[in-house]
Amino acid sequence: MNPAPNLVMVGPMGAGKSCIGRRLAERFGLEFVDVDQAIVEQVGSSIPAIFAQHGEAGFRQHEADTLQALLEQDNKLISTGGGTVLDPHNRQRICARGFVVHLHVSVPTQLTRLARDRNRPLLQRADREQLLHAMAAHRTPLYHEVADLSLETDHFSPAEATAQLVLRLAAQWRMSSAPA
């Protein structure tokens, strides 16, 4: 058993972190928080607007600040953005304060799932497939570095993936409060 005060979902966009995360949060009685949505609420602008105004570096700073604030709390299921693991401080914080679930998805499945999504600034380009392959090559080792548990989501519905994770989490994770 690996005790941790929070569950943290990591993985590429389109892996199912938010959809599956909401289901797991309900199942385990945790508060679900999507880091990107928390940033939008705090800043008062959409993710594309934040990228346009502050660039990716500005967005990543908001992401790091938001993640740190969330991880200081307990009993959360935190769904991170796909690039959260790029920052070594984020990786350290995630491992220190969460049981980390890595959801993996193949690039072809990502392309299918994200085909109509216009809310992801990094994908608003013609070479989406090449970009997703490059992101996977860079980020996948970082997801593996922080993961306590991994699940391939390509061939699972959200309900099936949730059921798989509930069984595995019951065997591997015990919710704990942080030391006082």
From Swiss-Prot:
Cofactor annotation: Mg(2+)
Name of the gene: aroK
Keyword Glycosyltransferase: no
Binding positions (Mg(2+)): 18
Binding site for substrate: 36, 60, 82, 139
GO BP annotation list: amino acid biosynthetic process; aromatic amino acid family biosynthetic process; chorismate biosynthetic process
Taxonomy of the source species: Bacteria, Pseudomonadati, Pseudomonadota, Gammaproteobacteria, Lysobacterales
Alphabetic keyword roster: Amino-acid biosynthesis, Aromatic amino acid biosynthesis, ATP-binding, Cytoplasm, Kinase, Magnesium, Metal-binding, Nucleotide-binding, Transferase
GO cellular component, one term: cytosol
Gene3D superfamilies in the cross-refs: P-loop containing nucleotide triphosphate hydrolases
Biochemical pathway: Metabolic intermediate biosynthesis; chorismate biosynthesis; chorismate from D-erythrose 4-phosphate and phosphoenolpyruvate: step 5/7
Subcellular location: Cytoplasm
Family membership: Belongs to the shikimate kinase family.
HAMAP family assigned: Shikimate_kinase
Matching InterPro entries: P-loop_NTPase, Shikimate/glucono_kinase, Shikimate_kinase/TSH1, Shikimate_kinase_CS
Its biological purpose: Catalyzes the specific phosphorylation of the 3-hydroxyl group of shikimic acid using ATP as a cosubstrate.
Residues binding ATP, per UniProt: 14-19, 120
One of the record's GO molecular function terms: shikimate kinase activity
Cofactor: record remark: Binds 1 Mg(2+) ion per subunit.
Superkingdom of the organism of origin: Bacteria
EC number, UniProt record: 2.7.1.71
Predominant location: cytoplasm
Complexes and interactors: Monomer.
Catalytic activity reported: shikimate + ATP = 3-phosphoshikimate + ADP + H(+)
UniProt name for this protein: Shikimate kinase
A Pfam cross-reference name: SKI
